[in-house]
C-alpha cells in the first residue's frame, strides 16, 4: 500500500534565492536567522533527518549519517506567496506573478463590489491584518462596513467582526469578491478574516476561509484521485487548490491540531496522498515578526516528529518542505523569496542521499506522482530514483 505524506511547514524558508534582490529580500533566511537570533534552535529529530546538512543552522548540526534524504528547492515561478508555492509543488509553474496592489484596489471595482454586497467597505490599503483590525475595528463595529485590505502578496482580504457580520454572510461576501476579481484584478486568493473582541482588544479567530482561483491545468491531486487513490487534505490545502482532487478533508485549528489530523489520516491506512499545511509558522509568527514564538513552534513540531515517523507503514514516504519564506528577523512583515527545505524519510528510502538544489518545487510533485503511479506532471523532474 503506497502512500505519500507531504507536510508543508508554511513559510519555513532556508535562505535567499539568487533573485531575492528583485523582491526586496536580500539577506532573508527564515530558519537560519531565527536560529541566530535565538542563539540556536533545538531540533534533534529534524537534525537526524538531515536538516542541518542542507544549510548552516545554529544549534542544528550536520549529521554524518542522516536518517533521511535532504536538499532544498528553488521556486521557478515568479512570486513568493502561498498559492504560487503550493501550485508549483503540485505541478503548476506560473509564467507571470499574480497581481499585487500596493496602492489598494481600483475605486471603480470597490464601488461595484459595494453595490453587489449591499455595503460600503473601509480600508482598501496594504496593512497587517492584526494591526488593521485594531485601527479600524471599532469603526467597522459602529458602521457595519467590512474592512478590505491587501498585503505585498496577491490577496484581497475582508475582515469582519463575527457578531456584526455573521460568518456565513462574510463567506458570501468573499465569494462575490472572488467572482468579481478577474482579468487584471485576478488575485491569487480572497481571504475571509473574521475577528472577535472589543475596542483595544480585537483578535482574529480561526474561522478564516480562503478562496483560491482554479489551477490552469491538471495538478498532482487530480492525478492521484484519477488513479483511484485517496487525496486527504489537512488545513487550508483544500482551499489553496480550490478543491481540486481532494477526496477527504479535515480542517485544522493551528499546528497542533494539524498534526493530530495528519496522524488520524495516517492511521486510516488508505493508499494515496496525505497533504498537510501547518500555517501557524506563517500566520501567527512570521507576519508578526515574532521570533521567539516562531522558534518555539519549530521546536514543538520537531517534538511531534517521532510520533509521525512511528506511525509510518512499510511503503509510506514522508516529505517535509515549505512554500516560501517569512523571515521574522527582518523589518518586513511579508513573505520572503527563499529556497525551501526538502526532507524525505521512509522505511524503503535509502538514507543519507543529498538531493541537491532542485530547480523547481514541481520536482517534489513529480516524485510523488511517479511513486504513486499516476500520469506525469506537466512540470517537474522526479528524484524518486535517488530515494529508492
From Swiss-Prot:
Pfam entry (one): Metalloenzyme
Cellular component annotations (GO), alphabetically ordered: cytosol
Binding residue positions for Mn(2+) 2: 282, 287, 335
Database matches in SUPFAM superfamilies: Alkaline phosphatase-like, DeoB insert domain-like
Pathway: Carbohydrate degradation; 2-deoxy-D-ribose 1-phosphate degradation; D-glyceraldehyde 3-phosphate and acetaldehyde from 2-deoxy-alpha-D-ribose 1-phosphate: step 1/2
Signal peptide (residue range): none
One Gene Ontology molecular-function label: manganese ion binding
CDD domains membership: PPM (cd16009)
Cofactor stoichiometry and binding remark: Binds 2 manganese ions.
Chief location of this protein within or outside the cell: cytoplasm
EC number: 5.4.2.7
Residues holding Mn(2+) 1: 10, 323-324
Catalytic activity: 2-deoxy-alpha-D-ribose 1-phosphate = 2-deoxy-D-ribose 5-phosphate; alpha-D-ribose 1-phosphate = D-ribose 5-phosphate
Cofactor requirements of the protein: Mn(2+)
Biological process (GO), any one: 5-phosphoribose 1-diphosphate biosynthetic process
Gene3D superfamilies (UniProt xref): Alkaline Phosphatase, subunit A (3.40.720.10), Phosphopentomutase (3.30.70.1250)
Described function: Isomerase that catalyzes the conversion of deoxy-ribose 1-phosphate (dRib-1-P) and ribose 1-phosphate (Rib-1-P) to deoxy-ribose 5-phosphate (dRib-5-P) and ribose 5-phosphate (Rib-5-P), respectively.
Stated name of the protein: Phosphopentomutase
Organism this protein belongs to: Desulfitobacterium hafniense (strain Y51)
Amino acid at each position: 500500500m503506497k502512500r505519500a505524506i507531504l507536510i508543508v511547514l508554511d513559510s519555513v524558508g532556508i535562505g535567499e534565492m539568487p533573485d531575492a534582490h528583485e523582491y526586496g529580500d536580500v539577506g532573508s533566511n527564515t530558519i537560519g536567522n531565527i536560529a541566530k537570533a535565538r542563539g540556536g534552535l533545538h531540533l534533534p529529530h529534524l537534525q537526524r533527518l538531515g536538516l542541518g546538512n542542507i544549510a548552516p543552522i545554529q544549534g542544528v548540526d550536520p549529521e554524518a549519517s542522516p536518517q533521511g534524504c535532504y536538499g532544498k528547492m528553488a521556486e521557478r515561478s515568479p512570486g513568493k506567496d502561498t498559492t504560487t508555492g503550493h501550485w508549483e509543488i503540485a505541478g503548476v509553474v506560473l509564467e507571470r506573478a499574480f497581481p499585487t496592489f500596493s496602492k489598494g484596489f481600483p475605486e471603480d471595482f470597490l464601488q461595484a463590489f459595494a453595490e453587489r454586497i449591499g455595503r460600503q467597505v473601509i480600508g482598501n490599503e496594504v496593512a497587517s491584518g492584526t494591526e488593521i483590525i485594531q485601527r479600524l475595528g471599532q469603526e467597522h463595529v459602529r458602521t457595519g462596513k467590512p474592512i478590505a485590505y491587501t498585503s505585498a502578496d496577491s490577496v484581497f482580504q475582508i475582515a469582519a467582526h463575527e457578531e456584526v457580520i455573521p460568518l456565513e454572510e462574510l463567506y458570501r461576501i468573499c465569494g462575490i469578491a472572488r467572482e468579481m476579481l478577474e482579468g487584471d484584478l485576478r488575485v491569487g486568493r480572497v481571504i475571509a478574516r473574521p475577528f472577535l473582541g472589543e475596542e483595544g482588544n480585537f483578535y482574529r479567530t480561526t474561522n478564516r476561509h480562503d478562496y483560491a482561483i482554479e489551477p490552469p491545468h491538471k495538478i498532482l491531486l487530480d492525478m492521484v484521485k484519477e488513479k483511484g487513490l485517496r487525496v486527504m487534505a489537512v488545513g487550508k490545502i483544500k482551499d489553496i487548490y480550490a478543491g481540486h482532487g481532494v477526496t477527504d478533508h479535515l480542517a485544522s485549528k493551528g499546528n497542533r491540531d494539524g498534526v493530530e489530523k495528519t496522524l488520524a489520516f495516517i492511521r486510516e491506512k488508505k493508499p494515496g496522498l496525505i497533504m498537510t499545511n501547518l500555517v501557524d509558522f506563517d500566520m501567527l509568527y512570521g507576519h508578526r515578526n515574532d521570533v521567539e514564538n516562531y522558534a518555539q513552534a519549530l521546536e514543538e513540531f520537531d517534538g511531534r516528529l517521532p510520533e509521525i515517523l512511528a506511525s509510518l507503514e512499510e511503503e509510506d514516504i514522508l516529505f517535509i518542505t515549505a512554500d516560501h519564506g517569512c523571515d521574522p528577523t527582518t523589518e518586513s512583515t511579508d513573505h520572503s523569496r527563499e529556497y525551501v527545505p526538502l526532507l524525505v524519510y521512509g522505511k524503503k528510502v535509502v538514507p543519507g542521499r543529498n538531493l541537491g538544489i532542485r530547480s523547481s518545487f514541481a520536482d517534489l510533485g513529480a516524485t510523488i506522482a511517479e511513486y504513486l503511479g499516476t500520469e506525469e506532471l506537466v512540470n517537474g523532474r522526479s528524484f524518486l530514483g535517488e530515494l529508492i
